[in-house]
Amino acid sequence: MVKLIHTLADHGDDVNCCAFSFSLLATCSLDKTIRLYSLRDFTELPHSPLKFHTYAVHCCCFSPSGHILASCSTDGTTVLWNTENGQMLAVMEQPSGSPVRVCQFSPDSTCLASGAADGTVVLWNAQSYKLYRCGSVKDGSLAACAFSPNGSFFVTGSSCGDLTVWDDKMRCLHSEKAHDLGITCCDFSSQPVSDGEQGLQFFRLASCGQDCQVKIWIVSFTHILGFELKYKSTLSGHCAPVLACAFSHDGQMLVSGSVDKSVIVYDTNTENILHTLTQHTRYVTTCAFAPNTLLLATGSMDKTVNIWQFDLETLCQARRTEHQLKQFTEDWSEEDVSTWLCAQDLKDLVGIFKMNNIDGKELLNLTKESLADDLKIESLGLRSKVLRKIEELRTKVKSLSSGIPDEFICPITRELMKDPVIASDGYSYEKEAMENWISKKKRTSPMTNLVLPSAVLTPNRTLKMAINRWLETHQK
């Protein structure tokens, strides 16, 4: 459903932020640099890294066109860069000289907001590079900032836990205590929840904080009816402070990264967990979806940025409810089964399956014996392949029926893992199951069929922690 396709390890210190444009990925770090990569092959651009800041770079963001990149730093500056050649366009100094923690472009590229450690927030004219408006929150440092998709207002989050809403004239529209121990990040979904009368639009806003929670809010604003912020729900998948959150471009997914070293991907419609990713070895500090592809970037204090790719077809299946998925599979017609066989690169079996009237229900009940004896499939390799694919289909039905994320299920036992370990093939398994697998002199990987380089099993504590957290929130 989601796979790690690339790891960037060029920074010399903690990765603080990552951001996508339509063609580039930008990352910034405690090492004072910003790096730019092409999305074609994830190679670093010739004019990267970008160097100017004298202290840690906390945040970076692209203008909507992708031609300009903004970066901000502990040195009290926000810098604009030309992404095509790396040329520095402007250096904008925070009026107070305070460390700048966050920066964000408005949707129309006319303004750039910067928030600082002393609680000041500045709106800059992104064309003239001059200060347009300045304000400040009552208490705490600025840690988060997000513009509404229509650009009529923006939200800031503070270390005191307050969400503050500002209009484009820097007038405070609303302030609300959102997270007890401080806000770390916030993001708007670019897709409206619905359109109402009188031009009223509703948007989802996600916020996360030191209280280990991700909260969803519904926001509306018109000049006639004013502003309204309504709390909707809390996502409690993490067991440590949540440092980052971001919506996918289509608004269908929400991702969060945490001090517990995990990344969680949620379905925004059902709020179910789709994936828990546990590859980072230290705090996950940032996460971002690409605007036009099914790519996700996650950055960490382990100095790396991981690039993940989603499978659209499988992802759509994962969003089905238990009844819908079961009904969908069991109600497959013979033609549906033929289509599935072709998709699995098993088109040679279409004729045999049609001749034997194999529909969805019969497909799920096929066994090793029935493939050989009843369907007369002579090739052992072909029988093994189709059986593997059917088992994958059964597993999806079973895991999604129970609501268990795929990453929590042992590939050998097909059950929820209690004591996950990482084998030398890089996959996680239930400890007892993998020990039994190896003790029977099966020195090949259950997942790849390649020879295991080593019999060493390493406890996957991060995954175990994520499973325990999931169990706590799903026990009835």
Swiss-Prot record:
GO BP term (any one): protein ubiquitination
Each WD repeat, start to end: 10-47, 52-91, 95-134, 137-176, 178-228, 237-276, 279-318
Domain annotation U-box: ranges: 403-476
A Pfam family hit: SAM_2
Domain SAM: 332-396
InterPro entries per the UniProt record, alphabetical: G-protein_beta_WD-40_rep (IPR020472), SAM (IPR001660), SAM/pointed_sf (IPR013761), Ubox_domain (IPR003613), WD-SAM-U-box (IPR052085), WD40/YVTN_repeat-like_dom_sf (IPR015943), WD40_repeat_CS (IPR019775), WD40_repeat_dom_sf (IPR036322)
PROSITE patterns assigned to the protein according to its UniProt record, in alphabetical order: SAM_DOMAIN, U_BOX, WD_REPEATS_1, WD_REPEATS_2, WD_REPEATS_REGION
Superkingdom of the source species: Eukaryota
UniProt keyword list: Phosphoprotein, Repeat, WD repeat
UniProt GO molecular function: ubiquitin-protein transferase activity
Modified residues (Phosphothreonine): 458
PANTHER family the record matches: WD REPEAT, SAM AND U-BOX DOMAIN-CONTAINING PROTEIN 1
Protein name: WD repeat, SAM and U-box domain-containing protein 1
Gene it is expressed from: WDSUB1
